[in-house]
Structures are given as structure tokens and as C-alpha cells.
């Protein structure tokens, strides 16, 4: 399954970009990043179907890493070919995008800078795929 991160803003050569790259290199699933301008630009349609869309949103569900992995594993096993992860700019997502998403998730109750959220998402995607592969990286409790 392709993991497609669609993010507002250019990450450039920042410390966050180094973290994203570090985790992206470890992910054995397909990986793609599309950067959009902070304002304007349209979210591209899925490259593959069937697909799922996950919007990173402060109002979203707070999942454990194992719960997140289970969702991705279920989608993969159901034949989903692409999961798109949408990260908004400073003002987040509009209501239409939230409503069209298959899942809204949040990394806790705090609000995170979108560049840091991208690095956190990359780590959680690595963790989820490692859980599904039976890799010892993740430890519960």
C-alpha cells in the first residue's frame, strides 16, 4: 500500500526534514510526499484506487500506535492501494475536507506546528509498518 503524505508548506532542509527522511528510509511500504503551497493549490486525487484519506486534525481521534497500525493493516488487507495523509497549514483544514476524510486523527490534545506534525507522522508510519511486520521497534506499556 502506498503511504502518500500531502502537506501544506515546504519543509526544505530543516531539522524536521531530516527526521522525515530518517523515518521514510526505514518504511518498507511505498512512500510519496506531495507538498502544496500554504494557501491555494488543490489536493491531488488518489494515484491508486481503492484509497483512503486520513486528515491530521486537532479534532481527530487519538489512537495508540497499535490502533493506528491495526487500521492501516485492515485497509491493506482489504485491498486499499493508497492511503493519503493530509497535513494542513497553520489554519488546518476546511470543513469540507474534514467531512470527506475517511478518518481524522490527532497527535494528542496539543496543537503542533505542521512541519513537526509531518515528522511525527513519518515516525508513526514507520512504527505502524514495523508493528505489522513483527519488528521489535515498538514496545507497549
From Swiss-Prot:
It is found in: Cytoplasm. It holds the Pfam family SPOUT_MTase. S-adenosyl-L-methionine binds at residue 88. GO terms for molecular function: rRNA (pseudouridine-N3-)-methyltransferase activity. SUPFAM superfamilies: alpha/beta knot (SSF75217). It is an enzyme of class 2 (transferase). Gene3D superfamilies: 3.40.1280.10. Its EC number is 2.1.1.177. It comes from the Bacteria. The keyword Membrane does not apply. It catalyses: pseudouridine(1915) in 23S rRNA + S-adenosyl-L-methionine = N(3)-methylpseudouridine(1915) in 23S rRNA + S-adenosyl-L-homocysteine + H(+). GO terms for cellular component: cytoplasm. The keyword Repeat does not apply. InterPro entries: Alpha/beta_knot_MTases, RlmH-like, tRNA_m1G_MTases_N. Keywords: Cytoplasm, Methyltransferase, rRNA processing, S-adenosyl-L-methionine, Transferase. Homodimer. Specifically methylates the pseudouridine at position 1915 (m3Psi1915) in 23S rRNA. Belongs to the RNA methyltransferase RlmH family. This is Ribosomal RNA large subunit methyltransferase H. It comes from Novosphingobium aromaticivorans (strain ATCC 700278 / DSM 12444 / CCUG 56034 / CIP 105152 / NBRC 16084 / F199).
Amino acid at each position: 500500500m502506498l503511504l502518500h503524505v500531502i502537506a501544506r508548506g515546504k519543509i526544505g532542509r530543516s531539522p524536521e526534514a531530516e527526521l522525515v527522511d530518517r523515518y521514510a528510509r526505514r518504511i518498507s511500504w511505498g512512500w510519496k510526499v506531495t507538498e502544496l503551497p500554504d494557501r491555494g493549490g488543490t489536493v491531488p486525487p488518489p494515484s491508486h484506487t481503492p484509497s483512503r484519506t486520513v486528515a491530521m486534525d486537532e479534532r481527530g481521534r487519538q489512537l495508540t500506535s497499535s490502533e493506528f497500525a491495526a487500521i492501516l493493516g485492515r485497509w491493506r488487507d482489504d485491498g486499499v492501494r493508497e492511503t493519503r495523509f493530509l497535513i494542513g497549514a497553520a489554519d488546518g483544514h476546511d470543513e469540507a475536507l474534514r467531512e470527506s476524510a475517511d478518518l481524522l486523527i490527532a497527535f494528542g490534545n496539543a496543537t503542533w506546528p505542521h512541519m513537526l506534525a509531518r515528522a511525527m507522522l513519518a515516525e508513526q508510519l514507520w512504527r505502524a509498518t514495523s508493528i505489522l511486520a513483527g519488528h521489535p521497534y515498538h514496545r507497549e506499556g
